[in-house]
């Protein structure tokens, strides 16, 4: 399903103006810590869902997709079941680097299974204002009527503008409005870590 004609979403740090200085403040998670966190989260999801029979993961492009795939792989190691993984592509319209304009639009979906009656878990890398998640949930309910929709994020950085809460969180980080949580994954970035950076005018 596609809304058509919209540019793909880019990470905030990819849209940094050339005159803006970025200062790395520290590493939040190493590659090993990311792997351990995803293993823990996989166990938490299976336990809370009462198994994997009606469970499916929906990764939000871009970095939510490899995270969802890794969690599904960890679940396969828990009970030997192949948990299906779908993809949602959300376009964000930004009016500056720190605030998202009122529009967050579902651009496309790649979900090859029915969602009716399913226990769905949305997976994203960073939870910030909540606008992306709201658009993702709207898109899911356009596809059908899942039994339950939960949210799993690697990092919750606060500053919510929507009444959105993650049920499964890798790590909660207190941030300022000028700071950016930068997630890098080997499938996309050829390196693996989570950093906290600050932008200076």
Whereabouts are the PLM-identified features?
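PRPP-associated nucleotide enzymes
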Residues: 1-201
């Amino acid at each position: 399903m596609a809304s058509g004609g919209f540019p793909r979403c880019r990470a905030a740090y990819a849209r940094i103006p050339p005159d803006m200085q970025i200062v790395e403040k520290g590493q939040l998670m190493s590659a090993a810590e990311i792997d351990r966190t995803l293993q823990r989260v996989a166990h938490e999801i299976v336990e809370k869902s009462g198994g994997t029979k009606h469970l499916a993961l929906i990764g939000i492009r871009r970095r939510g997709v490899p995270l969802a795939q890794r969690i599904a792989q960890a679940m396969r190691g828990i009970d030997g079941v192949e948990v299906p993984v779908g993809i949602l592509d959300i376009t964000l319209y930004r009016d500056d680097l720190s605030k998202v304009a009122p529009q967050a639009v579902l651009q496309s979906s790649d979900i090859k299974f029915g969602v009716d009656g399913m226990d769905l878990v949305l997976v994203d890398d960073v939870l910030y204002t909540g606008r992306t998640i709201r658009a993702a949930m709207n898109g899911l309910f356009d596809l059908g009527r899942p039994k339950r929709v939960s949210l799993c994020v690697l990092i919750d950085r606060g500053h919510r503008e929507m009444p959105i809460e993650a049920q499964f969180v890798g790590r909660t980080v207190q941030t300022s409005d000028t700071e950016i949580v930068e997630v890098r994954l080997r499938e996309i970035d050829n390196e693996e870590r989570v950093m906290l950076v600050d932008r200076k005018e």
